[in-house]
């Protein structure tokens, strides 16, 4: 919103429309207009006026939120001499509006906290606030709100205050932490039975624990700690207060992760939590699930904090295994949501024990894990009145999947075979109800793959028992038994006499709608593992494939069946493969031809993606072993299918989703036959370029990268592939030149640089000598700022591989030429690239991208270290040394230290470490 400042009346109208306009488009227009206002420089003055006038809750909330947003994102717009008056104004507003609405108070508290963090001239802000407001009981709620959000905002991603300022703030808050604790004690004394005040106290205390600035020795003997456990032990504590106290204890436990340096507080928390067992049982008796969940969170956090002690000194001191008993008590609760809270701890315990690899230690924990697994098997039981198959996508279905993953990770402590046999014996010896049987089969399916299938009579017995289950058992039992059979495909492979009965059993399932998808998945597993044995059943698989749509399968299950069929097909004699592949593809090709011939009409789907996906999976997994000189058996089939794929692509050229599936299908066809697809190269490239000039589907760039990968080393294909690249670059560059082109088209960026990287890998000299290399590199430099994981990774990989070409494979005859060409490129754009990479790391990209950037810098350094040293020095000179408010972002020493660390690095990871530390100064 440039130009004149809007009137307050106009702003009020927009706010009213945002909240009260019955027309959604009116709300949308108001939202857009107010968003533009918030981004403008007028927002400061307007929000201040709205807060002064206090016309209604909505306008005050908008103004408070705007203030917070402006301070977070546009603080540089204000002159330094206005900061003090802004602070005073905000403090006046929060005092005047303290009774209007809690959400407004929170927004203003955040604004004040963010201001304090960015205003170095406001020294000792905690002391100032406490002195100003602590004696007025009516001001305590908003004072506590400010003191709660202040530590939370220190590490906020919205504020780029830099590591130097952050360190200064944390030291300042640590210095005044005792003042805050004293204030909280005073608030407790004044609160009496005021529950809201106690909740604010606990929230504030938790926030200071989370920042890690409270003195643990001081806190160990503090009355606030005793009060927390008192509140948690009392049966009459309300749910809200209980949750606030629980959160605070969890924060305290998290804060003492380094137990040795916080021993007195660790001991107090340890003893305090152990006293809560009785209160937990009381909450269970009262069926108060909220409190039960809170206790379980506390018990889990206790175990997480003392994990090292539990593993290293089990049963001694802080390694006391009563901690695990508490979690197992929670695992016994009938609601599965309770035990689920502790899953992360059990994962971590398993990980630690796996690394220690100590049989004696493992034996101590075995009984605990066995008890946990029994509890989990119980939790996995469906309701006795459940009808049909188990749901996999609802909350309970997802819980069962997490149980399955956890069991797989912990089974080594019990022993897969021992556990499998125990579970089976419960089915064999008793006559449990169906829901118990189903849950046991579910756990058995989770561990079946980790049981050694070699000469294992129990596994054989289980397999035999399952395939002879009567059809009268509950559908859910049949469903899970089918899943178990699929997981036991290794056993079938070792005992091929079972193949026929297993396939017979699975075919019955395939013919029943509720079981069809599970049966298809199991057949897919059997095909994957028993490829050689399944070759004799190929005709049966072909029959299934021909009548695929007569089974009630999910699209994924149908594709899985075809994948299994293709894997078996690849094991047939070469002379049979061509004919069988043609048979396998014929149904899908006929369907595509039918869609091409029919006129578009209402009610009839003309979507070819189902058939394209099926062809893609067939090509992807038909990978026979072909000797050099032999014609690929799939070549003829793919050449026959090409006209149908080409026509489908042409018909749906404007539809990105369908074109993407066409390209995917062609990609796997090309990969399937490799250089055997040479006859398709010319017509395919011509069609790609023609369609791409009209419709910029990025999947064409990806398909281009596949063609370069397959043919880039063929002398006769290089010029044609370069022509393709140059033709594709023209519309690509035009697309990216549009406003916000990079941000709006990350897939195009990703696929463009995949294509360019393939060229560098397969035919570097062809690209380096071309006209297009400099524009591509310029776009790569521009794209380094793009905060998109895949796109950025592709850009960095291109830059790394491009520069590496100048030093790689120095024994090859084209080395000197490559070295010279890279030298020319770098002399033209090297300084710009280094400056951009440094700027990008400091101001644009998240930390996870730094290893990729470090690799690019490392490669530049390998080409010419002295020149790189100069480029880096120039780049560092261009960085801002102070914030707009005068806080030091980076000192001269920090700049010279970073330069030295990078330029003297002997390994790439040293560059990465230096970058990590340096970029924190700007975050």
UniProtKB/Swiss-Prot annotation:
One of its GO terms (biological process) is protein import into nucleus. Keywords: Acetylation, Cytoplasm, Nucleus, Phosphoprotein, Protein transport, Transport. One of its GO terms (cellular component) is cytosol. The modification Phosphoserine is found at residue 74. The keyword Cytoplasm applies. Importin, which transports target proteins into the nucleus. Specifically mediates the nuclear import of splicing factor serine/arginine (SR) proteins, such as RBM4, SFRS1 and SFRS2, by recognizing phosphorylated SR domains. Also mediates the nuclear import of serine/arginine (SR) protein CPSF6, independently of CPSF6 phosphorylation. The nuclear import process is regulated by the small GTPase Ran that partitions between cytoplasm and nucleus in the predominantly GDP- and GTP-bound form, respectively. This is Transportin-3. The gene is Tnpo3.
